[in-house]
Amino acid sequence: SQIGNTPLVRLKQASELTKCNIYGKAEYFNPGESVKDRAALYMINSAMENNKIEKGGTVIEGTAGNTGIGLAVVCKEYGLKLKVVMPNTQSEEKKITLKNLGAELIEVDAVPYSNSNNYVKLSKKIAADLSKENNHGVFWANQFDNLDNTKAHIETTAEEIWKQTAGKIDGF
């Protein structure tokens, strides 16, 4: 996979100001140019390993951007369809990127989470409705509550940082 194994970059000004070596993880080297690519890959791999979805299946997610882009990168590679439910207030650049990566956009009004028409709640409903008619599986990524989102960083990002620093870390 082209996702992960990103370099550490020493942040010169922060290091000089603190008299410590401060590093940042250059996640912009991922194909979707974001740390969210890791979470997307991990969530999709887990869903496939647990037979929640297979090639030809559909991933649904409510997202305002970067997780959707990460999912689009992974779905395109794995032969999965992606439907992204997003607030219509998002930038045209994000929308174009998602469409260019093959995602189907479902734009909705931006409303509070408490509203039943919130983009996250609508994505859950769409996934439930679609699962009744899809033979290859429908996977609601559910990034906000999906523990694989966090595990991605425990099992990949943290491991990489540990190796790249030879275990010499004073703070995280």
Where are these regions (language model features)?
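PLP-dependent amino-acid enzyme catalytic core
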Residues: 1-172
